[in-house]
Every structure is written in structure tokens, then in C-alpha cells.
Amino acid sequence: MSARKTAQRVEAWHFLANDRRFGHDDGNIAAPGYVYSVEGPIKLCEWGLHASERAIDALQYAPGNMIGRVVLSGEIIRGDDKLVATHREYLWIADAEETLRSFTRWSALQVIHLWNAPDIVRRYLESGDKSLRSAAESAAESAANLAANSAAYWAAHGAARSAAYSAANLAAYWAAYSAASSAANSAANSAAYSAQNDELEKRLFALGEAR
């Protein structure tokens, strides 16, 4: 992982646990308008206040469904898919569970043409009707032709998983499956992932504006 230091303000995304508490048992609860600080030296993955400039990258590290739009400042170290800083301010925080589930269904629909999806699976992905979710999951599990395009199948199967699963975890995993199944090579995969990020950020910004 490459890393370089900067000293500027950077807007980014940070997912929180559902109770908004920070990790490492430090007792802090995130709230909009507050600036949280740590003393250096900071180090990626080890010490400091982290966030990602792309929402799709932040999703990989999500401990829950609460999304925060943040500003990092002070000393900042940039990595490949995240940053760490000495200061992090929350501009707003929102519960993104339904937004993430909707995004997961959207991701699966982008590749549904790559496998012979049962009708009820398609209906659930298009509507988000919770009364169809259990039947859609069962139908996806019993689909006989899943080997034809396993990544597309798993993207749809994951979108229909039970509400007991974290929406953030589902969205992260199945967005990756969807991007992989739609891409013929690494460049195409990167483009598909960027398109997913654009869609996710559009939905998250709309969520923030609707608070």
C-alpha cells in the first residue's frame, strides 16, 4: 500500500457502528459538528482517524450502517483506498441501511442478464418488496444454472439475503461480485467499480440532503 503525507482539508466518507461509537473502546460517540482529534504520529491501519474519499472504498471498512460525511484535517496520510488524519469532523450522519439495501439490489440488477434469474428474484430486486425477500432467496439458492455466471448469481443471491445480515456488509460484498461479473478484464472491472461508486455516492448524498 502506497502512502504519502499531506496537510490539507479533505472531504471523505466514514461508516460507523449502528450506535455511532468509535472502535477501540475509546468511548466517543460521533455527532455532527464535532471535531475529533488524536495525537501523532499517525499510521494507516494502526493509529489515527480514518475515512475514504470514495464511498465504495469506505464501505469495505464499514462496522455498521451509519454513514458520515466528514472532513479530515491536520496531518493526513493517503493510502490506496483510505486516509488517516489527526482531525476528523462529521458534517452529517445518517442511517444508511435502506439506502445500502437499495444499492445492493441495484448492483445485482446490473448483471441479472448474465444468468437465468427466477422471476421472483427479478421482482424482488426491482421492487424491494420485503414480502418477496424470503422466496427470492430460496429461488436463487435452488437455481439450477448458477454455474453459468457465478458472480452474477451471487450478486443477486446476496441482495436477497435476510435482514439479519448487515446492509453495509451485503452492499460491500455484492457490489464487488457485480463489478467482477460485468467485467472482462481488470480495466473493465475498475470502470464498473467506479460506476458503482458514482451510484452509491448519489444515493448517499440524497440521503444526507433528506435528513
Each language-model region and where it sits:
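Short, glycine-biased loop/turn motifs at secondary-structure junctions and
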Residues: 1-211
